């Protein structure tokens, strides 16, 4: 047992409240991510044959559809039973729970619609946008951390793991099959876990942004950047999932692979197809 585990920082997840309305840090992170995407897109608008107003329209509706799709995807993929017993659960976005894969589908619908409306190829638009998506992903993962959700798997042999108050129930269940960790639990009343939200922030936010923007500097055929994004995100997500605690209602499939990893495999395969067929 180590004595260097990190404590989850104590703070109020609510920034301020006015009557029944409360502004949460979680939601603010998504807005900051969207702001950076919007700001960067306007600065880069000359890279695509669309004016600033059209780019703004695409981004506003893509962001809205990403939120809707992300929430619906989360409920469908991870909380199917919950919606039957508590239909209003889908609207409680401040409690966390967004699916990237659902959000991606929502954004694709918006981009497809505007590609037809503005007579601009779908992959021209998506290639223009994907180098900026890591802004949203990175800040979204910070939001997950602030919300104290999506924590990692138990690890007592690594100093920079963290004690998450929200993991208490899962820690108790984990002890049933791992009684040798009882002394750790007795001392901290929690089990140390990987800070998987910050791992994902680095992989899906910082590293993905750097790689995509390096490749974008060299002229690529249409569809190439979109394919590269799908391959890289899918690969980084698969890596991160090995450190992230599987959703308790789903667990690991075949005792090894998570749902997030399964959903990422088609992304990688389609990304390869896009790159091979890019023109």
From Swiss-Prot:
Listed Pfam families: LGT
Instruction: Report the principal subcellular site.
Output: membrane
Record bears the keyword Cell membrane: yes
Role this protein plays: Catalyzes the transfer of the diacylglyceryl group from phosphatidylglycerol to the sulfhydryl group of the N-terminal cysteine of a prolipoprotein, the first step in the formation of mature lipoproteins.
Compartments annotated for it: namely: Cell membrane
Pathway(s) annotated for this protein in UniProt: Protein modification; lipoprotein biosynthesis (diacylglyceryl transfer)
Return the NCBIfam families for the record: lgt
- Which keywords accompany this UniProt record? Cell membrane, Membrane, Transferase, Transmembrane, Transmembrane helix
Report membrane topology.
Answer: Multi-pass membrane protein
Q: Name one GO molecular function term.
A: phosphatidylglycerol-prolipoprotein diacylglyceryl transferase activity
Per its UniProt entry, which superkingdom is the organism in? Bacteria
The top EC class is transferase
Enzyme Commission number: 2.5.1.145
Q: Tell me what this protein is called.
A: Phosphatidylglycerol--prolipoprotein diacylglyceryl transferase
Cellular component terms per the entry's GO annotation: plasma membrane
Report the family membership. Belongs to the Lgt family.
Sorted alphabetically, the Gene Ontology BP terms of this entry are:
lipoprotein biosynthetic process
Q: Does Ribonucleoprotein show up as a keyword for this record? A: no
Transmembrane stretches, by residue range?
22-42, 58-78, 89-109, 128-148, 195-215, 223-243, 256-276
Where does this protein hold a 1,2-diacyl-sn-glycero-3-phospho-(1'-sn-glycerol)? 141
């Amino acid at each position: 047992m180590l004595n260097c585990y990190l404590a989850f920082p104590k703070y109020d997840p609510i920034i301020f409240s006015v009557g029944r309305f409360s502004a949460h840090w979680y939601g603010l992170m998504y807005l900051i991510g969207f702001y950076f995407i919007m700001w960067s897109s306007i600065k880069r608008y000359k890279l695509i044959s669309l004016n600033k107003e059209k780019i703004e329209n695409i981004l506003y509706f893509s962001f809205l559809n990403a939120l809707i799709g992300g929430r619906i995807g989360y409920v469908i993929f991870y909380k199917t039973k919950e919606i039957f017993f508590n239909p209003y659960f889908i609207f409680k976005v401040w409690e966390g729970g967004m699916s990237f894969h659902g959000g991606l589908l929502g954004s694709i619908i918006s981009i497809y619609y505007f590609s037809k409306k503005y007579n601009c190829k779908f992959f021209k638009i998506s290639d223009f946008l994907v180098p900026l998506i890591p802004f949203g992903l990175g800040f979204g993962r910070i939001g997950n951390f602030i919300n104290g959700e999506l924590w990692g798997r138990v690890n007592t042999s690594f100093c920079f793991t963290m004690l998450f108050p929200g993991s208490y129930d899962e820690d108790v269940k984990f002890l049933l099959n791992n009684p040798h960790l009882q002394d750790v639990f007795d001392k901290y009343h929690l089990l140390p876990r990987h800070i998987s939200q910050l791992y994902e922030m680095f992989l899906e936010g910082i590293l993905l942004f750097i790689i995509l923007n390096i490749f974008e500097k060299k002229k690529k055929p249409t569809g190439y950047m979109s394919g590269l994004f799908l391959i890289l995100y899918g690969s980084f997500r698969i890596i991160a999932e090995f450190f992230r605690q599987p959703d308790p209602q789903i667990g690991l499939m075949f005792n090894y692979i998570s749902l997030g990893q399964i959903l990422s495999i088609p992304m990688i395969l389609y990304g390869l197809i896009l790159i091979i067929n890019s023109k």
